[in-house]
Amino acid sequence: TVIPQELTRGGLSLNAMWVRNRTTKTNGVSYILQKGAAAVFTEEGQREIHENIRVYKKNAAHLMAALDTLGIWYCGGKNAPYIWMQCPKSMGSWAFFDYLLHEIQVIGTPGEGFGSAGEGYFRFSTFGSPEDTEEAARRLVALLGK
């Protein structure tokens, strides 16, 4: 919204009133976010959170089993929703990203995106659906187990 500085009503700057209104209305966390955050602490909210965590742990188990089968070093997945693996065959993290994308249409996050120390590592998320995660794990084993 553009309100010219020169625009006044009753000797008051409409621009200044608009800025005051917007900064007051948007000061702090919005009402809908506050209500959503409070819902976490209800019985239903707790049930849903625990169900989501159960799904994420199941997804992690599928990915970790695939990496175990392949003998690839990894960490995470047990107490975090991410699994970090070492890229196979000394591949760079972006090269591995491209390889997975083109060969089996599976994606993750190249470690180099987190800084130079991440080069040679790759991060998988467990936030996908169980079906997609199982399929990704199956495809990983099929591709890298050759």
Locations of regions flagged by a protein language model:
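PLP-dependent class I/II
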Residues: T1-K146
